[in-house]
From Swiss-Prot:
Its main location: cytoplasm. Gene3D superfamilies: Nucleic acid-binding proteins, P-loop containing nucleotide triphosphate hydrolases, Probable gtpase engc, domain 3. Residues 62-213 form the CP-type G domain. Monomer. Associates with 30S ribosomal subunit, binds 16S rRNA. GO terms for cellular component: cytoplasm. InterPro entries: G_CP_dom (IPR030378), NA-bd_OB-fold (IPR012340), P-loop_NTPase (IPR027417), Ribosome_biogen_GTPase_RsgA (IPR004881), RsgA_GTPase_dom (IPR010914), RsgA_N (IPR031944). The lineage of its organism: Bacteria, Bacillati, Bacillota, Bacilli, Lactobacillales. This is Small ribosomal subunit biogenesis GTPase RsgA. GO terms for molecular function: GTP binding; GTPase activity; metal ion binding; rRNA binding. CDD domains: S1_YloQ_GTPase, YjeQ_EngC. It comes from the Bacteria. It holds the Pfam family RsgA_GTPase.
Length: 290
């Protein structure tokens, strides 16, 4: 039999197959090979009615995220608050390059719009992201249709209202709502283990996790690929390995001068590139010491 792991709890894996859910365990040979089944895995398994089954094989994964681990994701809703905490395009772009690198479709959702005196600034920013090709929504009514036929996870800085949003999408989840700490301006972690939940024609992960940014982009080429607008323009650069910093006849810098490219995104690209290069230099120094 073949199915999808929709929940993992205390060593048991709950596999959905043809409308039924089976409780299974992983055979010991997975541990010997250093393999662990995760929520989202497509697996082959054996199970009889009303009895414990066993996972026999894990199919190749198209992508994965960590903390909590979840695999084979179709899209991720990146939740950014308009206020408390303040909207941060640099942080948003960090989430976006993580998702681009993992081949996960991003959807940007702006929470707490009601706290703004005027929504125009956020809407103007939204138009810039939409021009790149991203879904950028500011209401639940805009978000819900995007969940159909997709496996969706939710990510965002602590305190942006991840639990609140999930409770609005599926009230039966009854996720604990975090509070904003007055002293820190940051939310407290109030999430739990991951599992899938059927809602609005798709599946969502019932955890507002993924507030950490563990992206493994290690070079300029990968970073370029993680910026869709740079990726499209870079085919017109004179040099194939153009980093869009100092090279002549760079299509990205030309687009910046003509106003075709949003300067904010280019500034973030340069900052992230500098961080990658600094990490590489630090790594080289550590290796030399050894």
């Amino acid at each position: 039999m073949q199915g999808k792991i929709i929940k993992s709890l205390a060593g048991f894996y709950y596999v959905e197959s043809e409308g039924q859910v089976y409780q299974t365990r992983a055979r010991g040979n997975f541990r010997k090979r250093g393999e662990t089944p995760y929520v989202g895995d497509i697996v082959d398994f054996s199970a009889e009615d009303n009895s414990e089954g066993y996972i026999l094989a894990i199919h190749p994964r198209k992508n994965s995220l960590v903390r909590p681990p979840i695999v084979n994701i179709d899209q991720a809703v990146v939740i950014m608050s308009a206020k408390e905490p303040e909207f941060n395009s640099n942080l948003l772009d960090r989430f976006l390059i993580l998702l681009e690198h993992k081949a996960i479709h991003p959807v940007v959702y702006i929470s707490k719009m009601d706290l703004l005196d005027s929504p125009e600034e956020i809407k103007a920013i939204g138009r810039q992201y939409q021009a790149i090709g991203y879904d950028f929504v500011t209401s639940l009514e805009e978000l819900l249709p995007l969940l159909a036929d997709k496996i969706t996870v939710f990510m965002g800085q602590t305190g942006v209202g991840k639990s609140t949003l999930l409770n609005r999408i599926a009230p039966e989840l009854a996720l604990e709502i975090g509070e904003i700490s007055d002293s820190l301006g940051r939310g407290r972690h109030t999430t739990r283990a991951v599992s899938f939940y059927n809602t609005h024609g798709g599946k969502i992960a019932d955890t507002p996790g993924f507030s950490s940014l563990d992206y493994d982009i290690a070079n300029a080429e990968d970073l370029n690929e993680a910026f869709p607008e740079l990726r499209r323009l870079s085919h017109e650069c004179k040099f194939r390995s153009c980093t869009h910093t100092h090279e002549p006849k760079c299509a990205v810098k030309a687009a910046l001068e003509t106003g075709e490219l949003w300067p904010v995104r280019y500034e973030h690209y340069l900052q992230f590139l500098s961080e990658i290069e600094n990490r590489r230099e630090t790594y080289k120094k550590v290796i030399k010491r050894k």
